[in-house]
C-alpha cells in the first residue's frame, strides 16, 4: 500500500509514518514546517517529503491519503483554499482517511492497547510504560508524541504476536476536520491511564466539561470483564475532574494512584522513592528525574504495567534505567563563562516542551527543587499552542513562572498583550516581538552559572543553538538589570 500523509511532520503523523514504513508500506507526505526531532526521524527513514499542500500532489496517486488534523477547509485572505491538495482530493473522489482511523485499522487491531491520556505528562508516561514493558522482554509496539531516549525513535511496531502490547499516547485533540471526535476514541484500549485533566485546547473546546465528556467517551471503550481478562483504568486519585469522569459511568477495573488512599502511592523524594501498593512496599525507584509530576507519572506507568503481568518491583527497577524523552528538560548544551572577577561557571541551556501554565510551573518547580534557592533560572517561553495564542490561560502565567529569577516571553503574533499579562511579575519579566530581540535580552542578562530553560511546543526559532553560539562569545556587560530579591 502507498499512503501519502498530509501533515506528516506533526509528532503523531510522523510516528504513524514510521509505523507504516516498518510494515512495508510505501510512504510519502507533505507539510509546511519541519523541525527536529521529527524531521531527523523522517529523513533517517528515507521518507520523501513534499513542501506545502499543492494540488499537483494528487498526481502522486497513492492508494489512500491520510489526513492530519492540521488540515482544514479554511480559505486564505484572497479566498483561495489554504490546503489545495485537500480540495483536489475531495473533487477527485479518491480515498482518504484520518491518521487515528488508519492506525486503528492497520496497526492496533488484535493488540493489547495500553493508552495514556491526560492534559499533562502523556508523552513521558507513555515512554516510561513502553520502557518498562521492553525491560520485561515483551517487545511492545509504541507511538509516543516525542522521542524516548531509551529507544531513540517515537514509534515502532514491536511484537506482532496476537495480543501483543502496543503503548500509545492518547490525545484528546480532534481527529480531523471531517471527524471532530477526539483522537483517542479510535484506539480501543484494554488498559487506560488517566493522568490528569484540566482545561486546554481552547480552539476546539468551550470549557472543561466539554473535555470531560470526551474523556468519558474514551472510558466507554475500555472493556469490562471478558474472555481475555478485564480492562483496567488507572486514574490519578488527586484529580477532581477525573473523579467526575468516572462518576459518569465506569465498567472496568479501576486502580488509583497519587492520593493518600489510592492503590498506588509513593514514599520519599521524587528522585528516590518507595512504591507502595495499598500501603505495602513493592518496589523502589532511583533515577535522575525530578519533580512530583514524574513521581506520579511513574506510579501510573507501574500500575498499567502490572495489568499486563509486570510486577511493580520489576517495573520500578526498569525505571531506574529510564532516560526520559527528548525535549523534556533536555540539556542542549553547556558553555563555560568567565566573569570579571575571574570566576568561571557553565551556563546550561535546556529544552522543554511545556506549553501550558501548569506544565510550565511543574517544569520550573522541578528544576528549582533540584538546583536549590541560590541558582539563577532564566525562563524563556513561547505562547505557541492554540490555547496560549487565544489567551485562554494568560491569567495563570505569572503563577506558572514564579520559580524563575528572570522571564523572557516571545510574544510575536499574539492576539493579546503579553506585557500586560506579565505585569504581576514586575521587573523580572521582559517581552520581545522577535527571536532576535529575545536573544539580545537574554544575552544582556546572562551570567556565569545560569540555567536557561527554553519552553515551547514548537521549534522556538532554533533559539537553543543560537543561544549556545552567542554564549561562546559572551562578555560580561555593565550591569543594567539586577535579579529581583
Residue ranges and their predicted role:
Residues 165-175, 349-355:
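Switch II (G3) loop of P-loop NTPases
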Residues 174-188, 357-369:
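Switch II of P-loop NTPase G domains
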Residues 5, 19, 99-148:
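Walker A (P-loop) phosphate-binding motif
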Residues 11-16, 122-128, 150-152, 175-179, ...:
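Short glycine/serine/threonine-rich phosphate/pyrophosphate-binding segments
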Residues 39-43, 57-67, 73-97, 104, ...:
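Acidic, Mg2+-coordinating active-site environments of NTP-dependent enzymes
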Residues 1-50, 61, 91, 216, ...:
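ATP-dependent carboxylate-amine ligase
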Residues 44-51, 95-101, 144-151, 170-178, ...:
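Short gly/ser/thr-rich secondary-structure transition/capping motifs
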Amino acid at each position: 500500500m502507498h499512503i501519502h500523509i498530509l501533515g506528516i511532520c506533526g509528532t503523531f503523523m510522523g510516528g504513524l509514518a514510521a509505523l507504516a514504513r516498518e510494515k512495508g508500506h510505501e510512504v510519502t507526505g507533505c507539510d509546511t514546517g519541519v523541525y527536529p526531532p521529527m524531521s531527523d526521524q523522517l529523513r533517517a527513514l528515507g521518507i520523501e517529503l513534499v513542501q506545502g499542500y499543492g494540488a499537483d500532489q494528487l498526481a502522486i496517486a497513492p492508494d489512500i491519503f491520510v489526513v492530519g488534523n492540521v488540515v482544514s477547509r479554511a480559505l486564505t485572505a484572497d479566498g483561495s483554499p489554504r490546503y489545495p491538495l485537500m480540495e483536489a482530493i475531495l473533487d477527485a473522489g479518491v480515498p482518504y482517511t484520518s491518521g487515528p482511523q488508519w492506525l486503528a485499522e492497520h496497526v492496533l487491531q488484535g493488540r493489547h492497547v495500553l493508552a495514556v491520556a491526560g492534559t499533562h505528562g502523556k508523552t513521558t508516561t507513555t515512554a516510561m510504560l513502553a520502557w518498562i514493558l521492553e525491560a520485561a522482554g515483551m517487545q511492545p509496539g509504541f507511538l509516543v508524541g516525542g522521542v524516548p531516549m531509551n529507544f531513540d525513535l517515537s514509534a515502532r511496531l514491536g511484537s506482532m504476536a496476537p495480543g501483543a502490547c502496543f503503548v500509545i499516547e492518547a490525545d484528546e485533540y480532534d481527529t480531523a476536520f471531517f471527524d471532530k471526535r477526539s483522537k483517542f476514541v479510535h484506539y480501543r484500549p484494554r488498559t487506560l491511564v488517566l493522568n490528569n485533566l484540566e482545561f486546554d485546547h481552547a480552539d476546539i473546546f468551550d470549557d472543561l466539561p466539554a473535555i470531560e465528556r470526551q474523556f468519558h467517551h474514551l472510558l466507554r471503550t475500555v472493556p469490562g470483564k471478558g474472555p481475555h481478562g478485564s480492562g483496567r483504568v488507572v486514574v490519578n486519585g488527586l484529580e477532581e475532574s477525573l473523579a467526575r469522569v468516572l462518576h459518569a459511568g465506569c465498567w472496568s477495573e479501576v486502580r488509583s494512584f497519587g492520593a493518600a488512599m489510592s492503590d498506588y502511592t509513593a514514599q520519599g523524594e521524587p528522585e528516590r522513592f518507595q512504591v507502595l501498593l495499598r500501603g505495602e512496599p513493592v518496589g523502589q525507584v532511583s533515577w535522575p528525574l525530578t519533580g512530583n509530576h514524574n513521581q506520579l507519572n511513574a506510579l501510573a506507568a507501574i500500575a498499567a504495567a502490572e495489568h499486563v503481568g509486570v510486577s511493580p518491583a520489576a517495573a520500578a527497577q526498569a525505571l531506574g534505567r529510564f532516560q526520559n524523552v527528548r525535549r523534556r528538560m533536555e540539556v542542549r548544551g553547556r558553555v563555560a563563562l568567565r566573569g570579571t572577577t575571574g570566576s568561571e561557571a557553565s551556563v546550561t541551556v535546556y529544552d522543554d516542551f511545556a506549553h501550558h501554565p501548569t506544565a510550565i510551573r511543574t517544569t520550573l518547580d522541578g528544576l528549582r527543587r533540584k538546583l536549590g534557592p541560590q541558582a539563577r533560572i532564566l525562563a524563556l517561553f513561547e505562547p505557541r499552542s492554540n490555547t496560549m495564542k487565544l489567551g485562554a490561560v494568560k491569567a495563570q502565567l505569572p503563577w506558572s513562572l514564579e520559580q524563575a529569577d528572570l522571564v523572557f516571553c516571545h510574544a510575536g503574533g499574539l492576539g493579546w498583550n503579553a506585557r500586560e499579562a506579565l505585569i504581576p511579575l514586575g521587573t523580572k519579566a521582559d517581552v520581545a516581538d522577535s527571536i532576535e530581540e529575545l536573544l539580545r535580552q537574554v544575552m544582556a542578562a546572562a551570567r556565569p552559572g545560569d540555567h536557561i530553560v527554553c519552553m515551547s511546543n514548537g521549534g522556538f526559532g532554533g533559539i537553543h543553538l543560537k543561544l549556545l553560539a552567542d554564549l561562546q562569545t559572551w562578555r560580561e556587560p555593565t550591569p543594567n538589570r539586577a535579579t529581583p530579591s
